[in-house]
Amino acid sequence: QSETVERYIKDGKVKPDLSIPFGDKRMFHYFREESIRNIAKQYGGDLITPQNMADKFMKFIETMDMSYSYKPVLLKAIYEYMDSSGRVALPDVVDYFIDFYEDRKAHGMIAEKSTSIYQKGGYTRKDVEKNILSNPFKRFEDMRFLMRCKDVETIEVNPIIFRKLTREDWLHIVDVCDKSLEKYYLRLKK
């Protein structure tokens, strides 16, 4: 994950092979393939490759940590609206999020933690989009499981993963998401 690498660089745990300044405060860091393997080995990381990407995606879903309910809601939105290439229009995902959380509130249930825009209310579609892209989507994007095309406002399941997943895999993903949401909301009630 990019945040972890940035933190390791800042803490002096990892040294890039090349760093190029970008603007006043940012740097692009580059690593040789051998360096990446060594860093992963040193810190117990496991590289995501085209060969293991679909398996890593499924494992990530099975074991996903949840500070908020956003990851499973995003996956369910993707399943609901994706086309035959694994693409979904971002406005459809925004609609799904709004419908999901507003439906919970309409049925007298907690939408989310009190700090969440969905619990507070008064949010705009732009607020929801920003929330989706900064919270659940970014984590999937950092691992290269999902991609975003800004020009046409779509989110796409990485084609390497999408080609390997069957309908049964997607039904399993939705089932895992439903169970994760159920556990999350039980925990939130306490």
Predicted regions, residues:
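Intrinsically disordered, charged low-complexity linkers and terminal tails
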Residues: 1-190
